A protein has these predicted regions:
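Flexible, glycine/threonine-enriched loop-and-boundary segments that flank and lead into catalytic domains
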Residues: 192-203, 237-244, 251, 305-318
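Substrate-binding/active-site clefts of carbohydrate-active enzymes
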Residues: 199, 205-250, 263, 270, ...
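Structural preference for beta-strand elements that scaffold enzyme active sites
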Residues: 3-7, 40, 205-209, 213, ...
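Structured C-terminal cap/extension of enzyme domains
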Residues: 392-438
Length: 438
């Protein structure tokens, strides 16, 4: 296999309502990838996040993010009009997501959908609840309680709730019954739309790469129901938990990326059943889970990031001439700057090294020269954020800002992905044998 991919969070897609969704704009992005002869779309985690809105902070590893639900189908069903939606406050900045405003407006709209449709006789909703009973009930209860406690961390809920007192939970189930059903219904809507999007991607020859964090956050359903969910002490228990997570990921993605970060070191591991068995992958994850920061690089020896090949902490394995045919290589990770922004931050000596490596010192050529250098490597898959194809600067990075509130807020401007850009990417893919369905 020799192919290429684009990193683009769904939440960053263009939208008239403050945040990208699973609807028409996601399908349009798939159309763009297909026309560019790109066959992997890395979407970032799609989980229901905590109040930080970071995609790495999942309330539940299996629950989809309600903010990504497309509202157009409910306009078509007459629940509300486009004009009613446009009157809501989704935030005025077309270049950044205002999560507080988007969340308030989106949940107001989704409550209208629930009031109109959530209690109608619907065998498909009943079937969804039955098929997902192993996680859905706990998740919906947890989400309702999290809202009840005004999004405070789990340890501040009180011992009775935090330790799952039967009496306390029974009382809350009665008190929050309607809200619990609301959160169940949102998952039904989310996964209905997700299934449609995945089928569309498959039709276009685009494989979806999803990702999940190695450690689950403290305020999550998994740690609430199983405090040992992050434990790596016992091999068999660890493997059982991860096999369940991988089985779920196979229902959602074609390729799954597992991410772990310790101090300044980070590692990715990739799961696709034709590449590696679940047993072998769980063994790799166990090594990653037990590794110290200094050992992570060895555990993730097949993953590379161009930007990490330069500077004071440079590692030669990140340079494209070292990539082998099993490698999965990135321009940079989601916490790194864009190419243009990164080069501007380099000291003179390091910048000269980069320019000599990519063969140009001209700012207008640097981003595409880095991409070209990556694309001609031996790596099996090379991936770049869409921002680098667009040659955008630091303000368009996904995360790593000094102010954490600016993380995960970047939005793609509608009309940025032109036919000319698609043709340029397609030419590069064909030139370096990364085109065609894999």
């Amino acid at each position: 296999m020799r192919t290429s991919g684009v990193v683009m969070p769904i939440f960053s897609l263009p939208s008239d309502f403050g945040i990208g969704t699973l609807g028409r704009d996601a399908c349009d992005f798939i159309d763009f990838l297909a026309s560019a002869d790109v066959h992997v779309w890395e979407i970032m985690p799609i989980c229901h996040t905590d109040s930080s809105f970071s995609p790495h902070n999942a309330l539940c590893a299996r629950a989809g993010n309600p903010l990504l639900i497309d509202l157009q189908p409910f306009v078509d069903q007459g629940v509300f009009s486009s004009r009613e939606l446009s009157r809501m406050d989704w935030g005025r900045d077309r270049a950044k997501i205002s999560y507080s405003k988007v969340a308030a407006a989106k949940y107001k709209a989704l409550e209208m959908v629930f009031d109109a449709l959530g209690f109608l006789s619907d065998s498909s909703f009943d079937r969804f609840r039955e098929d997902n009973q192993d996680w859905l009930e706990d998740y919906a209860l947890f989400a309702a309680i999290y809202e009840q406690f005004q999004y405070l961390p789990l340890p501040l809920w009180g011992d009775g709730v935090a330790r799952r007192s039967h009496a306390e939970l029974d009382r809350l189930r009665i008190r929050l019954d309607r809200r619990i059903r609301f959160y169940e219904y949102l998952q039904y809507l989310f996964y209905g739309q997700w299934g449609q999007l995945r089928r569309y991607a498959a039709q276009k020859g685009v494989r979806l790469m999803g990702s999940m964090t190695f450690e689950l956050p403290e305020t999550s359903v998994e740690l609430w129901t199983d405090p040992a969910a992050n434990d790596v002490s016992f091999r068999d228990a660890f493997a059982d938990r991860w096999k369940q997570r991988l089985a779920w990921s196979r229902r959602l993605y074609d390729i799954t990326k597992v991410y772990r970060r310790v101090d300044e070191e980070e590692v990715f591991a990739f799961y696709e059943p034709t590449w590696v068995t679940a047993d072998d992958f769980c063994e790799t994850l166990l090594q990653i889970g037990r590794a110290s920061a200094g050992d992570l690089a060895a555990a993730g020896r097949y993953t590379h990031a161009f930007q990490k090949g330069f500077g004071e902490r440079a590692a030669a394995r990140h340079l494209p001439h070292w990539y082998d045919r099993t490698a999965i290589a990135y321009v940079g990770t989601c916490s790194d700057d864009t190419i243009r922004g990164w080069i501007k931050t380099l000291d003179k000596a390091t910048a000269q090294d980069v320019n000599e490596y990519i063969g140009t010192a001209l700012p207008r050529d640097q981003a595409w020269s880095v991409l070209r250098t990556m694309w001609l490597s031996q790596a099996a898959i090379v991936l770049s954020p869409v921002q680098d194809f667009l040659e955008l600067g630091s303000s368009s990075r996904l995360s790593g800002f000094e102010n954490p509130a600016d993380n995960w807020t970047w939005r793609l401007r509608r009309g940025s992905l032109t036919n000319r850009l698609a043709q340029r990417i397609a030419r590069m893919n064909r030139l370096f044998d990364r085109g065609g369905r894999q």
